[in-house]
Amino acid sequence: MFSQQQQQQLQQQQQQLQQLQQQQLQQQQLQQQQLLQLQQLLQQSPPQAPLPMAVSRGLPPQQPQQPLLNLQGTNSASLLNGSMLQRALLLQQLQGLDQFAMPPATYDTAGLTMPTATLGNLRGYGMASPGLAAPSLTPPQLATPNLQQFFPQATRQSLLGPPPVGVPMNPSQFNLSGRNPQKQARTSSSTTPNRKDSSSQTMPVEDKSDPPEGSEEAAEPRMDTPEDQDLPPCPEDIAKEKRTPAPEPEPCEASELPAKRLRSSEEPTEKEPPGQLQVKAQPQARMTVPKQTQTPDLLPEALEAQVLPRFQPRVLQVQAQVQSQTQPRIPSTDTQVQPKLQKQAQTQTSPEHLVLQQKQVQPQLQQEAEPQKQVQPQVQPQAHSQGPRQVQLQQEAEPLKQVQPQVQPQAHSQPPRQVQLQLQKQVQTQTYPQVHTQAQPSVQPQEHPPAQVSVQPPEQTHEQPHTQPQVSLLAPEQTPVVVHVCGLEMPPDAVEAGGGMEKTLPEPVGTQVSMEEIQNESACGLDVGECENRAREMPGVWGAGGSLKVTILQSSDSRAFSTVPLTPVPRPSDSVSSTPAATSTPSKQALQFFCYICKASCSSQQEFQDHMSEPQHQQRLGEIQHMSQACLLSLLPVPRDVLETEDEEPPPRRWCNTCQLYYMGDLIQHRRTQDHKIAKQSLRPFCTVCNRYFKTPRKFVEHVKSQGHKDKAKELKSLEKEIAGQDEDHFITVDAVGCFEGDEEEEEDDEDEEEIEVEEELCKQVRSRDISREEWKGSETYSPNTAYGVDFLVPVMGYICRICHKFYHSNSGAQLSHCKSLGHFENLQKYKAAKNPSPTTRPVSRRCAINARNALTALFTSSGRPPSQPNTQDKTPSKVTARPSQPPLPRRSTRLKT
């Protein structure tokens, strides 16, 4: 699975690389413009032998057409002055160190491939004169739009931008095979430093012998490792750099990612003539050196090219001395010191605790730089990074001093102010050797005994995890700076000793670079002190979760970059234990991400993002949001009417005797409702003979006893006797004794309603008569599905058909079937034929029955006594005709049934 993932990642990287290649054409125009500016600046500076720089972006070898950066070693000052170094560093840090996580590709270690992006976009440009005034390149110019062009294997995160401080870098990037802790620091911690070195500090190739200035031997360095490859040959010192690929042991390569292998394998294939150093903008250059920690025994000791970039007239003189890669590193004293210096020069980004040591060593460095010019300033930065190793390096620097008398005058030539600035910068980046600007171009003979070299890495492991090379290129206003860059490769023993340290430093994956501060400082030209302060303020961790601090010191013509790896903190995924580095560095420098919702702290941005996506965090966040919304709702104004209605008690309920229900609100409004009117009308007795409503049953009874009613009743009887004999069935005799006690009260309540109700009743009577006539006419033919004459069924605990003279129980359900029968239909037709002379009499008789029923119901309700059994002897006939069939109210129907 892991190999498949690596292959997928490699494929993705290749796809991204192809996209970037397409975008290169667009960027070439911008770079050409920058080149013009640089050429103008170079022309302004004293004419030096131009160093043709063909820079190939860190693209795969499919693009050989891209010129490689060939730094012809000449006495002229190196093209890479402080300003160019600044741009290179800026670009490196803009792109993030994780971009430089180059696969430890199998480099021949003779091809010095370095990402040219670090050269400040000096691609395919022949740099005429190294003496460059500080180019007024705004940070946007420095930042290449498509970073992955130069770093095809850079992760997407690195391309998107450096992660926030404290984000762990890919540990694999720091595990550089076949390198000293210094070189690993060079390569891993900085392909950026290598790029710096290549651009400004052409990484010195270890010279088997210390050739004098401009000597051909120096010009024939065998690029020991891709680091050396990263080092463009400096003038004079490196007339030609032989690129004899020394295959690094495959075990280390096998351990490394296939993507890195591909990158490394591709780049060594591209080899320029030995006289030309390939500076390929491939982050692999750093990775190319086999990891000493992983397989120190298997790894041949790569030769170290000692490059002494000297800005005497702003000329970088690089002594490229070739040591056979297979040759166990016999680091001469110079070689040992120089690798240290290289490491320091490249990026001796030592943790802050090392910075303290640097501060302690700073006075030493100043003294050495001035009184002991013999000691190369590189020794001091190493001493800072290496602690006890400082003394050894300084002592070694003394033989160097002898071998390099030129260095001393150079250091003297540098004004103390510059030294102080350099020291400050060294505190930041600990690139003390570079800090001392050496006026005289001198080739530092590499005479340091190998023993010192081997000792250095182990000590560095303790003091400075992987002695992260710190590169501070301080080009003072006019004093040339001599940058001693020595690719110090330790023998396997030394590698083993320093292996722990190397392991401690994982490769920076997207190392955080405070580019904003760098850009601001470069644009505004902050003081050195401010830059240092700012650099110190920036907490970060080199390697896993470390951030590469880059500060640009801009004074007059030159800028100084200081890259200080802050407290290296191992990532949990990092197999290499970087505990000593973490313990040595102050914990306060590690940036902590804190979640105030969950009260949890995270050591890296990735961990913090993972925490943010956890369901527990989301749940708590939702709870907080809910609470906040509830608080907001509680603060919203509430309408007064709502508050008043809440405070008020519900209105009392009142009983309506007419409707037999409770009602809310005003009595008058209730009486005006349609339901109340219907109930009241149904309860009022109605005389169907006289067509009169009575407010109370008492008045109705009195009316029935009156003579006028009796006369009209006799007339109606005479008419009905002709049709059917027994009209008495329609009359109900009720004992009315005591039924009229509560009538007076009801009369008073109903007086105000009587006028309106009488009018409404008259209209209804007329309407009902019309409807009855229509029904009378409509039932001419029989249909078995139609119920005819339903009105003639009168409920008397059952149903009696007055036409057929049949009775049906209420629960029998036969009333409807009877109405559908043919006999009932024939009888109905006979009845209608008999009623035709006076069709109005039928509704009258029907209403009488219904109204009588209603009157009795009202009497029983008002009196509160159960209805007495109908007494046939008391026949107080109140003949009531049936009303039109309307579904009776449930209340009345239930009472009648019961």
Swiss-Prot record:
Sequence segments annotated as region (Disordered): 48-69, 157-305, 318-471, 562-584, 859-898
Instruction: Tell me yes or no: is Nucleotide-binding among this UniProt entry's keywords.
Output: no
Where Phosphoserine occurs, residue numbers? 209, 350, 547, 821, 838
Q: Please provide the Gene Ontology terms (biological process) for this protein.
A: maintenance of protein location in nucleus; positive regulation of DNA-templated DNA replication initiation; random inactivation of X chromosome
Keyword annotations for this protein?
Disease variant, Dystonia, Isopeptide bond, Metal-binding, Nucleus, Phosphoprotein, Ubl conjugation, Zinc, Zinc-finger
Residue ranges covered by zinc fingers (Matrin-type): 799-830
State whether keyword Hydrolase applies.
no
| Compartment(s) of residence | Nucleus
Gene Ontology molecular-function annotations:
cyclin binding; nucleic acid binding; zinc ion binding
Family annotation (Pfam families): zf-C2H2_14, zf-C2H2_jaz
Which residue stretches does the UniProt record annotate as biased composition, category Low complexity?
318-327, 355-383, 402-435, 572-584
Cross-link Glycyl lysine isopeptide (Lys-Gly) (interchain with G-Cter in SUMO2) mapped to chain: 280, 340, 401, 549, 588, 680, 705, 830, 879
Which domain of life does the protein's organism represent? Eukaryota
Instruction: Tell me where it mainly resides.
Output: nucleus
Q: Point out residues bearing the modification Phosphothreonine.
A: 244, 567
Task: Spell out the Basic and acidic residues composition-biased ranges.
Answer: 263-273
An annotated GO cellular component of this protein is: nucleus
For bias kind Polar residues, which ranges apply? 170-203, 328-351, 384-395, 436-445, 859-879
The linked condition is: Defects in CIZ1 may be a cause of adult onset primary cervical dystonia. Dystonia is defined by the presence of sustained involuntary muscle contractions, often leading to abnormal postures. Cervical dystonia or spasmodic torticollis, the most common form of focal dystonia, is characterized by involuntary contractions of the neck muscles, which produce abnormal posturing of the head upon the trunk.
Q: Which PANTHER family does the UniProt entry name for this protein?
A: CIP1-INTERACTING ZINC FINGER PROTEIN (PTHR15491:SF9), PTHR15491
Question: Which proteins does it associate with, and in what oligomeric form?
Answer: Interacts with CIP/WAF1.
Q: What does this protein do?
A: May regulate the subcellular localization of CIP/WAF1.
Write the protein's name.
Cip1-interacting zinc finger protein
- Which organism encodes this protein? Homo sapiens
